[in-house]
Curated annotation (Swiss-Prot):
Glycosylated residues, chain numbering: N147, N206, N368, N390
Domain of life assignment: Eukaryota
Organism: Drosophila melanogaster (Fruit fly)
Compartments (UniProt record): Membrane
UniProt cross-references to SMART domains, sorted A to Z: CYCc (SM00044)
EC number: 4.6.1.2
Top-level taxonomy: Eukaryota, Metazoa, Ecdysozoa, Arthropoda, Hexapoda
Name listed for the protein in its UniProt record: Guanylate cyclase 32E
GO MF term list: ATP binding; GTP binding; guanylate cyclase activity; peptide receptor activity; signaling receptor activity
UniProtKB keywords: cGMP biosynthesis, Disulfide bond, Glycoprotein, GTP-binding, Lyase, Membrane, Nucleotide-binding, Receptor, Signal, Transmembrane, Transmembrane helix
Catalytic activity annotation: GTP = 3',5'-cyclic GMP + diphosphate
One annotated GO biological process: receptor guanylyl cyclase signaling pathway
Domain Protein kinase: 507-800
């Protein structure tokens, strides 16, 4: 059964035949089209086929090449070059029809050649060959198109992967390495093609391939590393030259395997590495370091490669473009070259009088020729139309200008030493040194041999009976024994250090502290030390902080590892030893750990001000530029130290892991001890995982088996999130409508969003920051971890942020503490003002619920004793027909009606010296004469209030029954009673006594819209005067028998104008104005208590204002004057604006909290 490639080729041939058949079915049309194309002399059109979505940056090479062609008078003289682009879309299968249709349409439009397509090009190249139309590709790597018996009009500027085989054979031939082994990593798809090409050329030149080994699906795991070790074990005895084909990371592990077997120290072995990496001479990358190229697998420094091992590595890599003015993707340069070599070919054809539509003729001017590439070097196109490619030989060399001697490892890096020169008369190129005075620095001063002089097994040299080596074997063995003993002693001391348990903390020396137990004498001093952190981040129980304890006289922080059982293995001991050795001012100090009772508790130094997350969440704490700069500088210095130490990386950098000590120095915590923390069951683990994931790099989120220590590039990403949080102070992702789960999913899978990667908003509307910070954040958040800067480079980018910091750390600390003190003073003053305003509101609400004297007693905590009053007046009111009204109304309508009525009553009683006791349903109870006694005025106050209520209720409409009004029934009685506060929760000021019951009976036996008063109230009103009452007669009162009662009808006020009603209740009354214009009328009465009171009336032609002051002076527009007390009946006429005031030393102090102003004006 034919394979899929054969099926695809067959289908391509069918498509081409169908298209050709369609054109041949209409020869006249085809001939007309060709004729029209050949008549085009002014503009030469070429067709461009590419996938726009994947080649946006690369596509710029095409218009640039067209522009350069049209500007060059030596190219296409008298003509102009243009192009017709077509987006062929993504290659979903091998049977694309869209490119063929586009090619047909462009051919009919008169194009002379096709540039492209990228990726697969077999079908398109076959169709172009059938039309005899040139096609030049800049990215296609299909090997089948090199067959010129079928694809005779196709050429490409991108060298196939197999072309490197010629350079490999040339290098081997240059150093006479005719025996070698090939090791191929099957992960790169081009690896097998390169290996087969090397094998074919080696066999053609009689080279011997000792071994041919494959590394299947290379992934840097223990299983794959063991596979590499097995290959080395099987091959090292019969080979000296290895040709390694695969990715750089696989080659590093292969070299590590050779180093572990100590094969590279003598310089007898060499590794020729072949990969598709482009060498950049401007980038000094220490490529032998595994940790740089493998960010998701970190090795301890003790296991990293020595540079001496890489002196036995020769790397063959593609030559980096030499043109210093061009910095574009490599495929863009190939695209430019494709246009230029075609234009040069047709220029020669036109100069010789040929036909540019003859594809074979045009291609004859391209095959077997060299051209100067825009990359800065010459490229040769062979007879198959394939570019040979340029390759560079790279080895470990001394850096230029380093001053180090040759062979010194002080300053060495991988540098280019040679290249390959092509000759059309030779199958393979010639290896040449770039500089003759800069050869390869061999480890033992010469190139290694492909085979030892005596053969791999000594078969080429006859054995001698006596060998001098036997003579030195004894001393050499003794030396080995001595060295072994020394190593054992060193190892023993190291093991003793690990077993010494210097990190262990005995819980007997630890005193756990509970800040809530303030009365405990042991904790009082500690509470004073820790209270500063409470001032910063609020209450201790609201802080995301750990427990604290006292250890050897020092306050330490405790963190428990939530594991059921812990086995302190050797690797965990090494972790604990390493943590004790880490010391830096911006790194939290690890004190030790306790493993008593099967649990692990980690002890670190205590940071009094909590975490950076707590500080940022405290809106009362102002963080200015100096605060932010100082904290950022501390974090960067701490992370640089971590990255340079054996810890290597943090892995969980976020604001909650940056702690602030009492000196406002930021210290990084929660790093290292990954094996000890592995598998712990943390409380609220899901929520903690979400918080960690918000600051985690996308490549780590996608890794299901991500290491606990993360990666250095991942730390750079996390620092960017942390810097964003510090500047915005709105969380790691600022103001966003997405949930934590959605944010993590978008970061993990950017393909879910149309606009690509998902990062925190950096627009000016979301965050007002300088451009250099915005640029630094974008670099830290790059999707490709290799593009992100390292932490030292981030510090350089943010150097401008630290411009305001002083070089002396002590001066910075004093400045920060001074600003913090000023901020704290302002905060205390603001909180004091807010407390005062809240106290005023609370007092106002309390005075509305209880009488002021009673409220003051309750506020002071004094008991409120019941008090008896000799004579008070009580009023009861009731809505007539309320029960019937409730049956015809909804509950909400009843509540609405009562609220309207009670609101009206409350506004009325505020004008009288009365106290509202309570409301029960529709009943309204008011008293006058308590808790502050007012003599005999209580009857007059209640009577005036009752008349006022009747006058008002007549105009009060029922909202849900607009045609009806409220009908009121009022009862009043005067007599003795007792009053006091009942209950402790929701205290009530209640009245007790027969007077209360009698007043209630007065109301219940009264009539609608009438005021029913008792005889006692009537007598008091007669003493006061001006109240008109009508005797009702004897009325049967329940529980009292027959009582003589009266109807209160109105109040007479002779000599008062309707514009002003005034009641003066004090002995001292003044009115400003001319003395001669005043007439005062005062009626003197005597109360039962023999207290003198005066009632007067003020008749003003102008409006009067009322004010309470502590003085007796009256101020008017003419100045200040004093008037004597009014002692004679008189009528007061105020022709000017007057202000009437009360003497606070008189009866004002006896008023209740709801008493009316002593002078009331109706304006």
């Amino acid at each position: 059964m034919p394979g899929p490639c054969a099926s695809a080729a067959a289908f391509s041939c069918i498509l081409v035949l169908l298209l050709l058949g369609c054109q041949r079915s209409n020869p006249l049309a085809a001939g007309a089209t060709v004729s029209s194309m050949r008549r085009l002399t002014d503009t030469i059109n070429i067709g461009f086929l590419a996938e726009y979505s994947q080649m946006r940056v690369t596509l710029g090479g095409l218009p640039l090449a067209i522009e350069d062609v049209n500007k060059n008078p030596n190219l296409l003289p008298g003509k102009k070059l243009a192009f017709k682009p077509v987006d062929i879309g993504h290659k979903m299968s091998a049977y694309r029809v869209k490119p063929l249709r586009a090619m047909t349409q462009m051919r009919e439009a008169g194009v002379t050649a096709f540039i492209g397509p990228d990726e697969s090009c077999t079908t398109e190249a076959l169709l172009a060959s059938a039309w005899n139309t040139p096609m030049l590709s800049f990215k296609c790597s299909d090997p089948i198109v090199s067959n010129k018996s079928t694809f005779h009009t196709f050429a490409r500027t991108l060298a196939p992967a197999s072309k490197v085989s010629k350079s490999v054979i040339s290098l081997l031939n240059a150093f006479h390495w005719n025996k070698f082994s090939i090791v191929v990593s099957s992960k790169p798809i081009w690896g097998s093609d390169v290996a087969r090409a090397i094998q074919e050329l080696a066999e053609a030149r009689n080279f011997t391939i000792s071994h041919f080994k494959y590394i299947s699906d290379y992934i840097p795991t223990t299983k794959t590393l063991s596979q590499i070790d097995k290959i080395i074990e099987e091959t090292y005895a019969t080979t000296r030259i290895y040709v390694f084909i695969g990715e750089h990371i696989a080659m590093v592990d292969f070299v590590r395997g050779l180093q572990n077997r100590r094969l590279l120290e003598s310089g007898d072995y060499i590794v020729v590495s072949v990969d598709d990496e482009i060498y950049d001479s401007n980038r000094r990358v220490n490529i032998m370091e595994r940790n740089y190229l493998d960010p998701y697998i970190r090795k301890e420094k003790s296991k990293s490669l020595d540079k001496i091992s890489f002196r036995s590595v020769i790397k063959i890599s593609m030559t980096y473009p030499q043109n210093p003015h061009i910095r574009v993707p490599i495929y863009g340069l190939h695209l430019y070259d494709s246009v230029m070599i075609y234009v040069r070919a047709i220029t020669e054809v036109l100069r010789l009088g040929g036909d540019i539509y003859d594809g074979n003729l045009v291609m004859s001017h391209i095959f077997n020729r060299s051209y100067h590439s825009i990359q800065g070097f010459d490229v040769y196109i062979d007879s198959n139309g394939d570019a040979e490619g340029n390759y560079t030989v790279i080895t470990l060399q001394n850096d230029v200008g380093s001053g180090a001697s040759i062979g010194s490892l002080a300053k060495m890096s991988m540098q280019p030493v040679g290249f390959f020169a092509y000759d059309k008369n030779s199958v393979i190129p010639e290896f040449r040194y770039i500089k003759n005075d800069r050869p390869i620095q061999w480890l033992n001063g010469r190139p290694p041999l492909a085979e030892p002089l005596c053969g791999f097994h000594g078969e080429l040299c006859p054995r001698k009976k006596l060998d001098w080596r036997y003579l030195v074997s004894g001393p050499l063995c003794a030396l080995v024994v001595v060295v072994a003993i020394a190593l054992l002693i060193k190892h023993y001391r190291y093991e003793q250090t690990l077993a010494g348990l210097l990190w262990k903390v005995d819980m007997k020396d630890v005193t756990v502290i509970n800040l809530g137990e303030y009365n405990n004498p042991t904790n009082k001093n500690i509470f004073q030390i820790c209270r500063q952190s409470i001032l910063v981040v609020g209450e201790p129980n609201k802080r995301s902080f750990t427990n604290i304890a006292l250890f050897r006289g020092n306050i330490v922080a405790m963190k428990k590892i939530h594991k059921k059982s812990v086995d302190i293995t050797r690797s965990i001991r090494k972790e604990l030893k390493l943590m004790r050795e880490v010391r830096h001012e911006n790194i939290i100090n690890f004190i030790g750990a306790s493993t008593d009772h099967g649990s692990v508790i980690i002890f670190t130094t205590y940071c009094a001000r909590g975490s950076l997350e707590d500080v940022l969440a405290n809106e009362d704490l102002h963080l200015d530029h100096m605060f932010i700069s100082s904290l950022v500088s501390d974090i960067l210095k701490g992370m640089i130290y971590l990255h340079d130490s054996e810890i290597i990386s943090h892995g969980n950098l976020r604001s909650s892991n940056c702690l602030i000590d009492s000196r406002w120095v930021c210290q990084i915590s929660d790093f290292g001890l990954h094996e000890l923390k592995a598998g712990q069951e943390e409380p609220n683990k899901s929520e903690l995982e979400l918080k960690r994931a918000l600051c985690m790099a996308p490549e780590l989120l996608r890794d299901a088996y991500r290491p606990g220590r993360g990666s250095q590039k991942g730390d750079v990403y996390s620092f960017g999130i942390l810097l964003y949080e510090m500047i915005g102070r709105k969380g790691p992702w600022g103001d966003t409508a997405y949930s934590k789960e959605e944010i993590i999913q978008f970061v993990k899978c950017p393909e879910m969003l149309q606009h690509g990667v998902f990062r925190p908003a950096l627009t000016h509307t979301h965050l007002d920051i300088p451009d250099y910070i915005r640029k630094c954040l974008c670099q830290c958040w790059d999707e490709d971890p290799e593009v992100r800067p390292d932490i030292r480079l981030v510090r350089m980018h943010l150097k401008e942020l630290q411009a305001g910091l002083k070089p002396n750390i002590f001066d910075n600390m004093l400045s920060i503490m001074e600003k913090y003190a000023y901020n704290l003073e302002g905060l205390v003053q603001e909180r004091t003002n807010l407390l005062y305003e809240e106290k005023k509101k609370t007092d106002m609400l309390l005075y509305q619920m209880l009488p002021r004297p009673v409220a003051e007693l309750l506020k002071r905590g004094d008991p409120v004793e019941a008090e008896c009053f000799d004579c008070v007046t009580i009023l009861f009111s009731d809505i007539v027909g309320f029960t019937e009204l409730c049956t015809t109304s909804t509950p909400f309508e009843v509540v609405e009606m009562l609220n309207d009525w009670y609101t009206c009553c409350d506004s009325i009683i505020s004008n009288y010296d009365v106290y509202k006791v309570e409301t029960i349903g529709d009943a309204y109870m008011v008293v006058s004469g308590l808790p502050l006694q007012n003599g005999s005025r209580h009857a007059g106050e209640i009577a005036s209030l009752a008349l006022h209520l009747l006058e008002t209720v007549g105009n009060l409409k029922i909202r849900h029954k607009p045609t009806e009004t409220v009908q009121l029934r009022i009862g009043v009685h005067s007599g003795p009673c007792a009053a006091g506060v009942v209950g402790q929760k929701m205290p009530r000021y209640c009245l007790f006594g027969d007077t209360v019951n009698t007043a209630s009976r007065m109301e219940s036996t009264g009539d609608s819209m009438r005021i029913h008063i008792s005889e006692a109230t009537y007598q008091l009103l007669q003493v006061i005067g001006s109240y008109v009452c009508i005797e009702r007669g004897l009325t049967s009162i329940k529980g009292k028998g027959d009582m003589r009662t009266y109807w209160l009808t109105k109040r007479q006020q002779p000599e008062l104008t309707p514009d002003l009603i005034s009641t003066v209740d004090t002995l001292d009354t003044y009115c400003s104005g001319p003395r001669e214009s005043m007439e005062v009328s005062v009626h003197q009465y005597c109360s039962p208590a023999s207290n003198n009171y005066r009632l007067g009336s003020c008749n003003c032609d102008t409006k009067c204002l009322y004010s309470r002051r502590s003085d007796d002076n009256v101020t008017n527009s003419h100045g200040t004057s004093e008037f004597p007390k009014v002692s004679e009946p008189a009528q007061v006429n105020c022709n000017q604006l007057c202000v009437c005031r009360l003497n606070s030393s008189q009866m004002f102090n006896n008023r209740g909290p709801r008493s009316a102003p002593s002078i009331t004006f109706r304006l």
